[in-house]
Amino acid sequence: MAKGVSAPAADLAKLGASEVKKFHSPAEHSVRKALPAAKGTAAATAQGAETAAGNPDLGLVLDAQSTSAHGIELKAQVLSSPGANLRVVYSWGDGTTDSTQALPGQEVSLKHSYAELGEYNVKVTVTDLANSAEVVNELPLSTVGSDFTPYAPTRLLDTRTGTGAPKGMVQAYSSAKVKIAGNGKIPAGVTAVALNVTVTNAANPGHVTAFPGGGTRPTTSNLNFEAGQTVPNLVVVPVGKDGTVELYNGSWTAVDLIADITGYFTRTAASGYTPMAPVRAVDTRSGQGAPQGQVAGRGTIGVQLGGWYVPSNATAVALNVTATGPREDGHLTAYPSGQQAPNTSNVNFKAGQTVANSVVVPVGADGKVNVFNGAWAGTDVIVDVVGYYSPDSSGAFMPVTPGRMLDTRAWGQGPMYPRGYIWMPISHGEQGIAGYVLNTTVTNTKDAGFLSVAPDTNTPDQYESGTESQLTRPTASTLNWTAGKTVPNLVQASSGGVNGVVDFWNQSWNTTDLIVDIFGYYETK
C-alpha cells in the first residue's frame, strides 16, 4: 500500500491573482427622469401630464471589484431624501437582472458571475414611486479571467540564428526578451502565453526563469539544466505591459535560448480549459492508439483525440509527450493535423534516454494531433492527455505571483518515500477552481523512475482522522528521470472539483526530492 504524506496546505488567496480590477461611477453620472404621476393624486393633471420629480437628492454611486475569473462584486450607494421607500434594479449587461429594496443612504452589495468573459455595461436603476422619481447610473466593467486561443506552433526566439533577438548567446545572469503582443498574428492586449522554452549549448549547470517583461523576476524556476544538456519545458507566463516575456539565464555562463508559441490568453471569450485525470492515448511499445513499433526516423504518427478522449469541438489539448528508447539523438514535434510539420520542437532526447515534456497544441479539423520524430532513427512515443481547451469550457486562466509550495529538501520530513505519494491541499473547499498550473522538479534522484500527478478523492479531514480510502496508483507519467538527474516539467493538474487535493506519486523504488511551484489556476466562476 502506498504511503501518503501531507504537504503544507496552499493558500490561493495569499498568493493573490496578478491583477484585481476596480471600477467606479460617481453620483454625478446619475441621470434623473420624472415618472408619470399616479392617477387621483394631487400632482396629476387632468391631461395626465408628467409631474416635476420630487426627491431632489436621489442618486447612485457605483463601485465594483473583480472577485474571480468570471465574477464581480457591485456596491451601490443609494442617495435619497429621508423617508423614501426605494426599489433598485440591477441590469448586469448579460441579459440578467436582480432587484432589491433600499433605504436612503444604504449601500447595497451584490455579487454576479458572468458565463462568458468580456466587457459589460452594468445599469442600476433606483425608483422612488412616491415622489415619481427615477435615477439611472451605468458602470462599464470587464472580467479578469483569460481564455485561450490556439496558435500554430511558431518559433518566436532562437538566439542561435537571431530569430526574435540579436544573434548570440544569452549571457550569465541576463535575460532575453521575447516579443509576444503584436508579433505575427498575436493581438495586442494578450495577457499570457503558452511557450515551449528550450535551453541548449550550456557550458555549466543553471536554470531559466520566465516572467513578464519589465516585471520583477520571481525566485522560482521553470527549467533546470546541466552542462551540455538541451532541455525544454512548457511555460504559461503572463505578458508584461510592454508586450514581452523575459527569459532569465540563471547560470554563470552563457546559453542559447529557444521559445516556441502554441497559444495565448486574452480577456475575451475564446476557449476555456477543462482538466482531466491523466489518460494514456498512445503507447507505440504496445500499439495503443498507434501502430505497434517505434516511430521511424523522420516519421510521423497521427493521434485521434477529438471525439475520443476530448470533445469534438476542442480547439487545443494539454498533453504529456514522452520519448523512450530512442536509437539516436533527436526531438519530437507536436502539431495539428492538416499542416506541415513546423520548425518547432517539444521534446529533446539523447540516444537511449526516456524524457517527457508537457505540450499544449492546437487540434486539427479532424480532431487529430501529429507527432513528428525529428531524429534519423526510430523512437517509441507515449502520449498522455491531461486536459483540453474548448468554447464550452469555462475554466479561465488566473495567474498568481509565482510561489514555491513544496521543497522536500527543506520541509523537515525528508525526500519522497519509494513508491509513496505526497498529498497537497491546494484549494480544498473552494468552489470553481478547476485546475492548477504547476511546475514540478525532481532532484537528488537515486534511481530511475517517473512522477505521476493526479487528483485525490480523499479530503484533508479523512487523512487527518485516518479514514482515507486507498488510492489506485496512476500509470500516466508527468516526468521521467535517471539516477543523479534534476528534471523539471510543467503540469496542468486537475483539482478534482471542490476537493482541491492533488497527489504527487514517486514511481521509483528509491527516494527523490520534489519541488513544486505554482504559476496560476483555472477558474470556472
Give the positions of each predicted feature.
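Short edge beta-strands and adjacent beta->alpha junctions
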Residues: 1-67, 73-84, 89-92, 102-525
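Short, solvent-exposed loop/linker segments at beta-strand-coil boundaries, enriched for Pro/Gly
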Residues: 94-98
